[in-house]
């Protein structure tokens, strides 16, 4: 229905769609799979990236305007993972460059001396971390986010062979 087309678009879901179709294309081919991956990539690249402050937003309106400008490390991780997988699928250097932009942003904005902080406003000021759990313990740092960062960084390393990525994966 046309109502569904006008719904909000979570950037995590968009990244997962990009990862999925890129992975399927890498495994079995199929131009439709590549077309679907490219569609998800174009939306991510053209609408979800904060060109002023870095990183990807939490949620977009159907028309590509920002619905929720929160930045979450978990969200950045999925975008890095998806962009790196897309690069492996089609060798689009622009996608790899964007994955590295997000990597650099995470390493600059999300780390302290111990781990990765998770929830930020659009200007990277820390906010309450309640986006991933409606109940239970709310924490500034979780293993779930670190796990997904490692996942994204590992595929970025596979895609690029970059030593900076290798050091961060340690």
Regions found by a protein language model. Give the residues of each.
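Glycan-recognition and catalytic cores of secretory/periplasmic carbohydrate-active enzymes
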Residues: 2-170
């Amino acid at each position: 229905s046309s109502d569904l087309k006008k719904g909000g678009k979570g950037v995590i879901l968009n990244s997962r769609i990009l990862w999925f179709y890129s992975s399927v294309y890498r495994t079995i081919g199929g131009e439709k799979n590549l077309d679907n991956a490219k569609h998800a990539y174009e939306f991510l690249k053209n609408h979800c990236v904060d060109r002023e402050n870095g990183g990807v937003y939490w949620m977009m309106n159907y028309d590509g305007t920002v619905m929720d400008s929160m930045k979450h490390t978990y969200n950045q991780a999925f975008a890095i993972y998806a962009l790196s997988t897309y690069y492996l699928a089609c060798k689009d250097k622009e996608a790899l460059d964007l994955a590295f932009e997000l990597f650099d942003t995470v390493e600059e904005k999300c780390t302290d001396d111990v781990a990765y902080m998770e929830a930020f406003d659009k200007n990277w000021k820390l906010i309450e971390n309640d986006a991933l759990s409606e109940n239970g313990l709310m924490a500034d740092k979780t293993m779930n986010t670190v796990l997904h960062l490692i996942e994204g960084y590992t595929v970025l390393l596979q895609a690029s062979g970059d030593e900076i990525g290798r050091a961060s994966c340690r």
